[in-house]
Amino acid sequence: MDLAEYKSRYGGRDDAAPGWDAIDSRVREVYPGQEPKHWGTVIKHVIGGPDPIDGISAYSCTDGGIDHLHFITYGYTSLYYDEEAAGGDYSRFGFEMTFRLASKLPPLEEPMWVCNLLQNIARYVFKTGKWFEPYHWIPANGPVRADHGTDIVGLAFLTDPTLAPIDSPHGRVEFIQAFGITQSELDSFRDTKQTAEAIVEHHRKTNPLLVTDLSRKNG
């Protein structure tokens, strides 16, 4: 899309969010007719808000053999009207983050800790300028959910199994999923005994959508 077409289609609208709309369009293909649970910030990051991610949506999913919530961020990419971003190769960082949490449907509690986790990952990316690609990994420096006592203490990253990349008006957007890993798996990465790719693909055999289960034990 060239700048003239961009201005013609989106210009003059105070609420224009072509990047956000493009993400919504892709997600609706996967979850047609479903109204997600959504958490938004009070002040958008672009105008000085403290949280880098402006919104997080969660969809109920029963695919892959595990009931779960599928979280999707809005904030790593250019979401709002921006003539300088129009027609780019990649939209800002070029990805949005996703996360799948094993959960009863509907969930018994508000999973706000997931929103905090995703915001903390984004703070790292925005502060350092370093982004994640499939089969990268990071330690969480403790349980991913502090009040749970879970053995999940790190994250590996992969291409989201169901959300295909999109070409938004601001450039390409990929969907990178975080998957919870245990201390022994982190240790195997550090000792180069196994790669993150090997661990992810091992779990994919029995957990095709790579749903994070907080009850999964170390070992």
Where do the PLM segments sit?
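Acidic, proline/glycine-rich low-complexity IDRs
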Residues: 1-93, 97-219
